């Protein structure tokens, strides 16, 4: 809980703003060697608490406030759950125009319950309307990823 509280404060308080795709590497430098697909990660997460992995995936959305988180989705299965990604020690942020691009990231996948307060904060960061945000009334168990490094592939 302390980690997520810190993340809420960090997202709102950092002055650095990230936009544009001029950089390819963020955080720990990584490449595609040994990476598994997001769909393979979903299979690997069945029945376990966490997995250290290098994963490729499609970015579906990015924090529009600072770039302090992104969502990853399956390229093949549009019904698959989305994975919420944050960045180790808030040492880097993603470009705010990264949605629709493919990335490879290294770090740890895990499941965690996200509070209503945090869900509303992230919905606000994403630019959802007040009416959409008000519909958030229950905590949600989510697949999350703490990335130590990200590389933009396209």
Give the role of each language-model region.
Residues 11-154:
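OB-fold and OB-like single-stranded nucleic-acid-recognition modules
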